[in-house]
Amino acid sequence: MSDKTNDDKTLSVNPKKTLTLKRPGVEQSTVRQNFSHGRTKAVVVETKKRKFSRPDEKPEVEAAAAPKPAAPAAAPQQAPASAPVSASAAQASAPQPAPVKAPATKAPAAPSAPVTKPHVAQQRPVHQRPGGQQAQRPRPADRSGMVLNTLSRSEMDARRRALEEAQIREVEERARAVEEAKRRAEEDARRAKEREESARRQAEEEARLKAEAEARRKAEEEAAKRMPQPEARSERRDDARPAPYGARPQQAGRPQGGRPQPAGRPQQGSPRPAPIIADAAPIAGKPLPQSQLRKPGQSDDDDDRRSGAARRGVAAKPEVRAPKVVKGEDDRRRGKLTLTSNLEEEGRSRSLSAMRRRQEKFKRSQMQETREKISREVTIPETITLQELAQRMAERSVDIIKYLMKQGQMMKPGDVIDADTAQLIAEEFGHTVKRVAESDVEEGIFDVADNESAMVSRPPVVTIMGHVDHGKTSLLDAIRHANVVSGEAGGITQHIGAYQVVQNGQKITFIDTPGHAAFTAMRARGAQATDIAILVVAADDSVMPQTIESINHAKAAGVPIIVAINKIDKPAADPQKVRTALLQHEVFVESMGGEVLDVEVSAKNKINLDKLLDAVLLQAEMLDLKADPDRTAEGVVIEAQLDRGRGSVATVLIQKGTLHPGDILVAGSEWGRVRALVNDRGEHVKEAGPAMPVEILGLQGTPQAGDRFAVVANEAKAREIAEYRQRLARDKAVARQSGARGSLEQMMNQLQVSGTKEFPLVIKGDVQGSIEAITNALDKLGTDEVRARIVHSGAGGITESDVSLAEASNAAIIGFNVRANKQARDSAEQQGIEIRYYNIIYDLIDDVKAAMSGLLSPERRETFLGNAEILEVFNITKVGKVAGCRVTEGKVERGAGVRLIRDNVVIHEGKLKTLKRFKDEVAEVPSGQECGMAFENYDDIRAGDVIEAFRVEHVSRTL
């Protein structure tokens, strides 16, 4: 070996080894480790020597590299194979430059790790593979003299199974350990979270208590500092006002560069005391005023004492000079604006009134004065918001919310509460409660007691009722001497007419009602608004269904009946038959020992009309009808319609009081001011007394026929009542459309109806009564499968909005005695909406019935054709299986429906694909003949099966 410099890297060539690049100062050696079953492994050990030096010494540069270690392959050649050589490691750690050969004695066979110093071990370079390039791995010596016992196959299998079971157990134990660790970690995390939450709550509570105590202490200090001392404060402000250009005084004893907080310095937010100006030299050539050169009240003796102390050598605190930075007039306003500096400025002082208010507030807080509680009577409706309740109680809504929070309820000012909760809150705040219902707005409007001393006789109200075409309107026309029938379509009365006639100087009010079945509700309203009912029965037609219905309505209303046997001039007239038929319905006329008046009349020839009127007046005299004309008007709406030129027009019958133009009235859910009163002859009148029918102009909307009306004091009351009734009607409509969830029966009905088909319609009519009759008639047409749905109905002409609604809901438009304007017609033609016009209700119902019948699914009707028995099954290419059959009953037609029956069980139903006889396609095969049949999309046929042929027909249904 030769010494080399540190930069010299030598290459050692060995024919048995690969080329290696040695690092200077590093010695390498190889040791061998023994393992079980005679296995060994060679390990390369590197040892680097490091020279330690004191911190004050400079490290010496090594002049020569470390001595070259012995060849790592020499040791294994001299030592036995069973003993690892550790001498090279010892040589590497020895300080001698020359290597020493290991003795040839046998070393103990203990596989030990390389002997290295842990604190001087050198890390491998990143690019160097461990032990791969420094030295060649020596070949293990031949293991001579060692005998391995071979295991049998059963032992090896047993060991393998034991090893596999051990591995499985190890995996399971590891999984259990992981689960246990995970569970323990989750438990620890949960407990730690609970501890943190508890500590956080405790810290928040302590912080809150500390903040409250601190705030209380600050408030007390603030109150003590702000005690009203006007004179002292003004003197202090005058004496302690800082000079604009004076230097800031320094406190004695303050070290240079530091800024400790003085002991008596007030906290932030409290008023800062005025600064005391010490002696300071003039700055920037400006002499300071005398008041700023020394403190107020300071004498020259103080200066002499201070200078004398300095001369006597007394240790005095060093005087700290003010900073040299001087702000100009503009620079003074660039600093940070704080509350303290803001309050100290002279221009921002409080006004005298603000000072007085502050003093009064402070006195009240000191004396703990409480305002006198004012108890109020709070009116509480069924539902009320918190904000409105607070306004009625003259309380703050915040106080109500705080009270509810104490009760465990989190609410906002806009939340709605019920009357019980509102009552509890109001009583808790010391108020008295007056509970009112929402319907109380209607109290005092209807059924007001009459003044008995002011009661006068009034005309009777007579309703003419009877079957269709029995002469009701003709009789009234004969009485009124006016041709009313010619104005009705088809001679049928479509809506109620109210008229007044005079007989022997006395007035009689007549109400004409429709007779056909669709106008049941209108007859019922007419009976309720009447005093006497005239039952018109044709002498040649006797009692009919609507006659019976009219009798029932009159009995239900409790009004007396006068029977008018009409058409006695006809040859087939039989008045006695009519009287006998009325006995079956408990109507006993006077001629047959009863109390019901009966008169035989002829409206066409005007026979016995005066006797009929005398009977009406006699019955009215027996009833002793009276009313108070001086009270507010009250009555019932007979009919309402929307007139193009006059707006909403309502025909009303006044039952009590007198109605004047200008009165404010409420009719159903509509209200308005009476603009005009028109009688039955089209004349404007200035007043309408009891039992007088008139038309009212001026309502905001069209009321429903049968609604009661009453005069109210002002518009606010009328608007409140109308809004309440509109809200009720809206809620009912929503509940009806959405099928509000009620009982189980209602829910089941809703489920059944949900599968029905609907026929949407938009209906516009001339008067409300006709629309109501059409709606009721269409409702009766509905079945479980189809029904008419009225999207919109109203009185008046057809407008563009009706067309838009019909287009959105895919509905048809029906006009009854009304027409569409030009814009509506153009819009309907453009959008493809059908508009149909009718003037007779029967035609309308028939057309709608026919249209609804088209929505019904057709009826499936099946006709049996015959049976055939399969004798043999043939498999034909491109056709499939073909059944060779014999027709045993009836016949089989091509294209007919078939059922495949096997053991009296239908296993397939389909259609015939082919029907052949002797390779010819035939239309049908009669009984007793053989044929070939194939099914569509079905091949599972066997000999012995029976084929049943049938024909299916779809028959359209009608309502």
Swiss-Prot record:
Region (G3): 512-515
G2: annotated segments: 491-495
Claim: Cytoplasm is one of the keywords in the record: yes
CDD domains in alphabetical order: IF2_eIF5B, IF2_mtIF2_II, mtIF2_IVc, UDM1_RNF168
Region ranges (G5): 602-604
Region (G4): 566-569
Superkingdom of this protein's organism: Bacteria
A UniProt-annotated Pfam family: IF-2
Keywords: Cytoplasm, GTP-binding, Initiation factor, Nucleotide-binding, Protein biosynthesis
Compositional bias annotation for Polar residues: 27-37
Statement: the UniProt record of this protein carries the keyword Cytoplasm: yes
Location in the cell: Cytoplasm
Residue stretches of biased makeup (Low complexity): 63-118, 128-138, 246-284
Biased composition (Basic and acidic residues): 1-10, 154-225, 232-241, 318-333
Region (Disordered): 1-374
InterPro entries registered for this protein in UniProt: EF-G-like_DII, EFTu-like_2, IF2_assoc_dom_bac, IF2_II, IF2_N, P-loop_NTPase, Small_GTP-bd, T_Tr_GTP-bd_dom
All residue ranges annotated as the tr-type G domain in the record: 457-626
Binding annotation for GTP: 466-473, 512-516, 566-569
Job of this protein: One of the essential components for the initiation of protein synthesis. Protects formylmethionyl-tRNA from spontaneous hydrolysis and promotes its binding to the 30S ribosomal subunits. Also involved in the hydrolysis of GTP during the formation of the 70S ribosomal complex.
HAMAP family: IF_2_B
Family: Belongs to the TRAFAC class translation factor GTPase superfamily. Classic translation factor GTPase family. IF-2 subfamily.
Record PANTHER family: TR-TYPE G DOMAIN-CONTAINING PROTEIN, TRANSLATION INITIATION FACTOR IF-2-RELATED
Record-given protein name: Translation initiation factor IF-2
Provenance organism: Brucella abortus (strain 2308)
